[in-house]
């Protein structure tokens, strides 16, 4: 069974575990999704190594920017935004770990806002300075 999850702090507000449990069951996917309430991510690679079934995880507040420096590769979107909300865990045949960072906030925002924008829309007030707001800045 593969394991996926969410890292962040605090996670009491998150509905991800329930959502993915239902999704995996409906799609007959042999996987589980767990919330990992991590106060800090300073030793991310070691933490991933302690979870041998972990194939990937989502990243939420306050770690979207902090994880960037600990990843092996970044997608073009993650590089442009400077924040990551999806990490793919690749376990190489020689035993090494590769952590690939992605940002789906940018695509999610731009696809959802595009139908609502008109040429007269030239300014926006963005509240926040975290990883998601950075994606909004890039998206606009």
Can you describe what each PLM-predicted range is?
Residues 8, 103-106, 113, 117-140:
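Glycine-rich adenosine-cofactor-binding loop
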Residues 2-117:
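Phosphate/diphosphate ligand-binding glycine-rich loop within oxidoreductases
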């Amino acid at each position: 069974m593969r394991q996926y999850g969410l890292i962040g702090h605090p996670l009491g507000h998150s509905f991800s575990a329930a959502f993915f449990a239902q999704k995996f069951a409906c799609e007959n996917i042999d996987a589980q999704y767990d919330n990992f309430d991590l106060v800090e991510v300073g030793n991310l690679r070691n933490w991933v190594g302690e979870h041998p079934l972990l194939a990937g995880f989502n990243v939420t507040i306050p770690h979207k920017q902090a994880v960037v420096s600990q990843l092996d590769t970044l997608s073009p979107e993650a590089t442009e935004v400077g924040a990551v909300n999806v990490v793919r865990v690749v376990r190489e045949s020689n035993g090494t770990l590769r952590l690939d960072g992605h940002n789906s906030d940018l695509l999610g925002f731009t696809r959802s806002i595009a139908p609502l924008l008109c040429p007269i829309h030239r300014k926006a007030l963005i509240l926040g300075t975290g990883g998601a707001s950075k994606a909004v800045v890039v998206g606009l």
